Amino acid sequence: MKQILLISLVVVLAVFAFNVAEGCDATCQFRKAIDDCQKQAHHSNVLQTSVQTTATFTSMDTSQLPGNSVFKECMKQKKKEFSSGK
């Protein structure tokens, strides 16, 4: 039992050391996730606005743009990845 705990501790420390060596802690990883999701959302919004007519676009709220849901889904996925330790 002690050996399993020791091996687990070594693995956790190795992962932590790798992340520190990469210069990216949890805050850094969270910022990268937000940046990635913002880029995906922006791309979706650009595609949507390029096909909207002026009349329908001016009546749209920003929450109706596809990037809003893309960002939310992306952040949900990133949260799952963080909680699973990937």
UniProtKB/Swiss-Prot annotation:
Tissue-by-tissue expression: Salivary gland (at protein level).
Residues spanning the signal sequence: 1-23
Subcellular location: Secreted
GO biological process entries: vasodilation
Main location: secreted
Disulfide bonds: 24-28, 37-74
Keyword entries, A-Z: Disulfide bond, Secreted, Signal, Vasoactive, Vasodilator
A GO-annotated cellular component: extracellular region
Effect of mutating residue 28 to S: No significant effects on binding to the host receptor, induction of cAMP accumulation and erythema formation in host skin
Assembly: Interacts with human ADCYAP1R1.
Additional remark text: Vaccination against the protein protects mice from infection with Leishmania major. Several synthetic peptides derived from maxadilan act as antagonists for ADCYAP1R1 in functional assays and in rat maxadilan/PACAP-38-induced increase in blood flow pharmacodynamic model.
Record function comment: Potent vasodilator. Activates mammalian ADCYAP1R1, a PAC1 receptor, and induces cAMP accumulation in host cells. Causes the development of erythema following superficial injection into the rabbit or human skin. Influences adaptive immune responses mediated by host dendritic cells. Reduces surface expression of CD80 on host dendritic cells stimulated with lipopolysaccharides (LPS) and induces concomitant increase in CD86 expression on a subpopulation of these cells. (Microbial infection) Probably plays a critical role in the enhancement of Leishmania infectivity in the host attributed to sand fly saliva.
Designated name of the protein: Maxadilan
